[in-house]
Amino acid sequence: MRKKEISMKNRRATTRRMRDLLAGLLLLSTAGFTAQTQAGVALGATRVIYPAGQKQAQLAVTNNDDNTYLIQSWVENADGAKDGSFVITPPLFAMQGKKENTLRILDATNGQLPQDRETLFWMNVKAIPSMDKSKLSDNTLQLAIISRIKFYYRPAKLALPPDQAAEKLKFRRSGSSLTLINPTPYYLTVTELNAGTRVLKNALVPPMGEASVSLPSDAGREITYRTINDYGALTPRLKGVMQ
């Protein structure tokens, strides 16, 4: 019996030592990695508007850091899939520290997009940091950062000026939801949306379409809201009434 007790004690001691050793190794390996979030590359706008018939649109990219970055850019459609409707040049380039470059966006749609309303795409710019050669032997985790902004293709001669679109928005209560109705040919990014004293979620309302947000049962009928204009700025606060 005594031999069995000693054997059990030895096993428990061995298990404890193994557990402590594994914990120590995990701590060391975690400490050996440094997550470097690269925030040095900034875009010159929060959205891109591409007017139909224009040869190109431009987007400034600035490297505020001292390090070099590899910049990769592409366009996605509204569903998030890569799309060849627009060509970006240069699509891939090295950007030195404290420098600025310009991305040129060229129309390759051949007039195939709707001409009575805007079409939404997404502009993606990935900044991949260069690796310091002196740290190649270290366990350093380099993180690439993707900046993703809205990219609107805007047909020519739309019936309504873009700065008049926000005031055309309509609102309808549908059970526990508020439906935002956009009769204009423009996408409307609605923010600071309130029903009475209740604060509601932001919404992106497609042209000639609708979007819905949750509506508390005690929400008031008076609606106040703002939208974001072509320059990324907030429009004046507007009022609406729930139908």
Regions found by a protein language model. Name each.
Residues 6-24:
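Bacterial N-terminal signal peptides that target proteins for export
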Residues 83-111, 197-222:
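Intrinsically disordered, low-complexity Pro/Gly/Ser/Thr-rich segments with frequent PxxP/GP/PP motifs
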